[in-house]
Regions:
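Feature marking well-ordered beta-strand scaffolds used for ligand recognition
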Residues: 1-143
Length: 143
């Protein structure tokens, strides 16, 4: 994904989505925030703790960490820090600010695999690695 795409169109507030890999869980007021590493943040209305209701999904590629304070969600997106203004009664979140290049880039961050992999030819200037596309290689591996 190019840097332009990541920073202009990739972050979106969407309807609730199915939960994949579970990450960090935060409670703020009557809401729960569940990160899905690499994907974004699921937001739940927790007015009734016995039956939390999904209210929205904030799509944030490369997300790993989140914090919530005084009506704001702070989240990383690969190398950037994002600040959202939360309007939970209206089930919305607005990206207020993006602090670019706050973290070191890790090209392996979103590559969930149990197998050791080496990715060649990563050009950080072109964007971020969001998935693996296996290719056939005849190269011999040193033992």
């Amino acid at each position: 994904m190019s840097w332009d795409e990541l920073r202009s169109t990739a972050v979106q507030v969407r309807a609730p989505q199915p939960i994949g890999t579970r990450g960090k869980l935060l409670i703020a007021g009557d809401h729960l925030f569940l990160s899905e590493p690499g994907k974004g943040v699921h937001v739940f209305d927790n007015t009734d703790p016995k039956a939390p209701r999904a209210v929205m999904f904030i799509q944030i590629p490369g997300n790993v960490d989140i914090a919530v304070r005084e009506g704001h969600l702070y989240a990383d997106s690969f190398v950037d820090l994002l600040v959202f203004e939360l309007d939970l009664p209206n089930r919305s979140a607005k990206l207020l600010h993006r602090l670019e290049d706050q973290y070191a880039y890790d090209p392996y961050q979103t590559l969930a695999t149990d197998t050791a992999v080496h990715v060649e030819g990563i050009d950080k200037t072109k964007g971020v690695v969001v998935r693996l596309e296996p290719v056939q290689s005849n190269a011999k591996v040193a033992q």
